[in-house]
């Protein structure tokens, strides 16, 4: 069994430390109040048993809380008072320097919490450590100086989660849709250098990767670009190559058909190089956040403005999917699944059924998904039904990064819909499981506590908003001055972009399944519990509408991914309520509205059921189905895609994509338990060295490749197949 020290280091559990601490507290009191050696040993043994039952590494604070409870249970009030006083004095000493130990431990790679915080960051790398060091300072400033103490306390206790406090000290927003079209067509400035409109497709791709890196370094969330914005440059290259071929062939007896063949072949080679530039630049770039950019590439034929552009876009999409199917090589020279860019493919009337013009692209996408877990899928049909603007027109557009969706918006200056160049201000998540447990199953209390927690979330979201108010465009010129999000003047404040629906701000939620299970005794898939689940969702939407009307800001409900926070919430719930069977007996809680990962349900029933909840998550949500190796059953994959098109707006298929560098095994790397800790192990050779294992799993919309904390690892282990 392990224990996590205050600096984040993970060390073996030592019962003698409990005995020593309680003995010191006992020795500080006089006479009959002192405990016997036998009593102290019994207390230590009871605490050890409780820690063992949690089946995870516990923190020092959790152990001390359990010791206090044991002392109170045996009426040892004087000893408990001395023990608590000692804890308080030590905490005051630590407050004089709140970050030193954690920073030093992460530099020496001893901080287990940091090691497993982000599935796409390698904490042993210097650049990542610099980001984490800055993050520790930001979190400390946020907790001590920048946030209301009540919000800080609620965050620490797991009632809510104030996302990305490691960036809150700076005036940064969350995620966005990059207006790549504006930047490429009208020019931009990168690091003080003017970049004019590119004269070829390959140059456009190269500039796009530079923009991606710059944008990622000035925000903390994901970003999305559309391949449609690159499509016009295919014809630019075509004409350029055609002129070159004409010059080369002047005076030669070459037919126009032959010249056209040469042009198209050279053009295809350039498209290949351009797409390859994006793929390899994205996975090898290191932003100031200490990681590759969290970038999503959108593939939507319906965005093309004319037949030529659509045909060229189809070529780019085909090449993008082919290259992702191939993968990238690891250190051993083996083709593996990269985490980025995330790909989103739109299912539409032109590509969803046999005989349609672009059905071949959907077949290729299905083949790629079966091997590499991408692309994910948006149904144009369902999105046009759900994303309707004030003029009654439906729109299809990509999410910002993983799953955060903008609300429909009509630009008051042009009267036209606008999506690229918009962004999200930030997220605060409510822990629905805590609301339920705090109510003790009483529905009247539940709704009262629910409203209190939502009010707390509202205040926290207002803090997010106020942190951005007054930000000058100079804070991030690539975003606010040079087209990624706006073309503001130097020194101009971004305030007008924070109101009126231009940007969104998100109320996140997590643990709907556990919340409903505790209140009703049933899963929300049960007909008797589903109405309550839907009423919880509707209530949060109603609050967002209420806040929006009062403040002229687009609050929207967001299905929180909870990458590492799932573990934090689970530990907080166990600390506050103990082990409640079926509710807090796991080291994770369920993401957003999802069916519990261990609940038996088929893919089609799951997608149909969750579609009702996705509709009530307008600020963003994604559904998934867990599938086995489908590379030899693409017909089944196509049937799932057809079902997605007809039934749900946004969904993905999860499979496994692993490789052991020690023995060459390319099947599923297993999760095994060792001394109370879950570890990854090659079933063929027993290799457990994470540096020699390539494991790709869907974490929360993105694919993670740097392993996960114990809570998320248990969740991955518990997943059942839906096909």
Question: Where does each model-flagged region fall?
Answer:
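Amphipathic, well-packed alpha-helical segments that form the structural scaffold of globular domains
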Residues: 23, 458, 462, 513-517
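Conserved catalytic cores of very large enzyme subunits
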Residues: 89-501, 522, 526-688, 694
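Metallocofactor- and cofactor-centric catalytic cores in central/energy metabolism, strongly enriched
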Residues: 271-275, 279, 517-518, 712-718
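Charged, amphipathic alpha-helical regulatory modules used
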Residues: 1-110, 717-722
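Contiguous, well-ordered alpha-helical segments that form the cores/surfaces of helical PPI scaffolds
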Residues: 299, 505-518, 538, 698
């Amino acid at each position: 069994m392990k224990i996590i020290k205050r600096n984040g280091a993970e060390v073996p559990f030592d019962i003698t430390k409990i005995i020593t601490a309680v003995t010191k507290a006992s020795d500080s009191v006089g006479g009959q109040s002192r405990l016997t050696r036998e009593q102290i040993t019994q207390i230590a043994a009871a605490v050890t048993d409780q820690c063992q039952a949690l089946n995870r590494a516990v923190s020092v604070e959790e152990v001390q809380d359990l010791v206090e409870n044991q002392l109170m249970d045996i009426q040892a009030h004087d000893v408990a008072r001395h023990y608590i006083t000692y804890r308080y004095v030590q905490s005051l000493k630590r407050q004089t320097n709140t970050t030193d130990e954690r920073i030093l431990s992460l530099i020496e790679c001893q901080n287990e919490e940091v090691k497993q915080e982000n599935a796409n960051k390698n904490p042993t790398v210097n650049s990542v450590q610099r980001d984490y060091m800055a993050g520790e300072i930001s979190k400390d400033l946020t907790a001590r100086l920048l946030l209301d103490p009540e919000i800080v306390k609620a965050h620490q206790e797991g009632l809510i989660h104030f996302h990305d406090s490691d960036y809150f000290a700076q005036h940064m927003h969350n995620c966005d849709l990059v207006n790549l079209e504006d930047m490429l067509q009208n020019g931009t400035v990168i690091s003080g250098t003017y970049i004019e409109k590119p004269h070829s497709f390959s140059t456009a791709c190269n500039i796009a990767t530079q923009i991606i890196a710059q944008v990622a370094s000035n925000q903390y969330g994901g970003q999305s670009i559309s391949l449609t914005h690159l499509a016009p440059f295919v014809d630019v290259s075509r004409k350029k190559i055609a002129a070159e071929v004409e010059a080369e062939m002047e005076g030669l007896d070459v037919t126009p058909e032959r010249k056209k063949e040469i042009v198209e072949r050279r053009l295809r080679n350039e498209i290949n190089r351009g797409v390859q530039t994006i793929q390899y630049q994205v996975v090898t770039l290191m932003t100031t956040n200490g990681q590759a950019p969290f970038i999503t590439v959108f593939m939507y034929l319906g965005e093309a403005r004319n037949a030529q552009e659509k045909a060229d876009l189809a070529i780019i999409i085909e090449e993008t999917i082919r290259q992702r199917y191939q993968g990238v090589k690891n250190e051993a020279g083996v083709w593996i699944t990269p985490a980025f860019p995330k790909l989103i493919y739109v299912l539409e009337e032109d590509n969803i059924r046999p005989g349609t013009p672009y059905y071949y692209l959907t077949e290729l996408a299905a083949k790629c998904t079966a091997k590499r877990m991408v692309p994910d899928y948006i149904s144009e049909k369902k999105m046009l039904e759900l994303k309707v603007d004030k003029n009654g027109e439906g729109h299809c557009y990509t999410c910002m990064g993983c799953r955060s969706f903008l609300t429909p918006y009509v630009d008051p200056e042009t009267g036209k819909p606008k999506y690229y160049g918009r962004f999200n201000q930030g997220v605060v998540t409510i822990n629905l499981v805590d609301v339920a447990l705090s109510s003790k199953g009483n529905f009247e209390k539940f709704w009262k506590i629910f409203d209190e927690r939502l009010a707390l979330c509202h205040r926290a979201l207002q803090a997010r908003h106020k942190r951005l108010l007054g930000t000058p465009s100079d804070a991030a010129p690539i975003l606010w001055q040079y087209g990624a999000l706006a073309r503001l003047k130097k020194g101009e404040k971004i305030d007008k972009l924070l109101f009126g629906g231009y940007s969104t701000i998100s109320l996140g939620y997590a643990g709907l399944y556990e919340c409903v299970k505790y209140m009703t005794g049933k899963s929300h898939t049960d007909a008797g519990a589903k109405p309550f689940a839907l009423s919880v969702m509707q209530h949060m939407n109603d609050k967002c509408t209420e806040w929006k009307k009062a403040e002229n800001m687009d609050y929207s409900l967001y299905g929180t991914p909870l990458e590492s926070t799932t573990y934090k919430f689970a530990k907080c719930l166990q600390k506050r309520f103990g082990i409640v069977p079926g509710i807090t007996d796991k080291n994770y809680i369920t993401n957003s509205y999802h069916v519990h990962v261990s609940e038996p349900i088929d893919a089609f029933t799951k997608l149909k059921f969750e579609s009702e909840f996705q509709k009530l998550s307008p600020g963003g949500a994604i559904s998934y189905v867990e599938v086995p190796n489908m590379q030899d059953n693409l017909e089944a994959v196509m049937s799932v895609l057809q079902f997605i098109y007809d039934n749900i707006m946004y969904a993905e298929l999860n499979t496994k994509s692993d490789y052991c560098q020690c023995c060459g095994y390319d099947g599923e790397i297993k999760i095994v338990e060792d001394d109370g800790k879950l570890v990854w192990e090659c079933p063929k050779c027993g290799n457990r060295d994470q540096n020699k294992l390539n494991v790709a799993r869907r974490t929360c919309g993105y694919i993670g490749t740097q392993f996960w904390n114990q809570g998320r690892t248990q969740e991955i282990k518990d997943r059942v197949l839906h096909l």
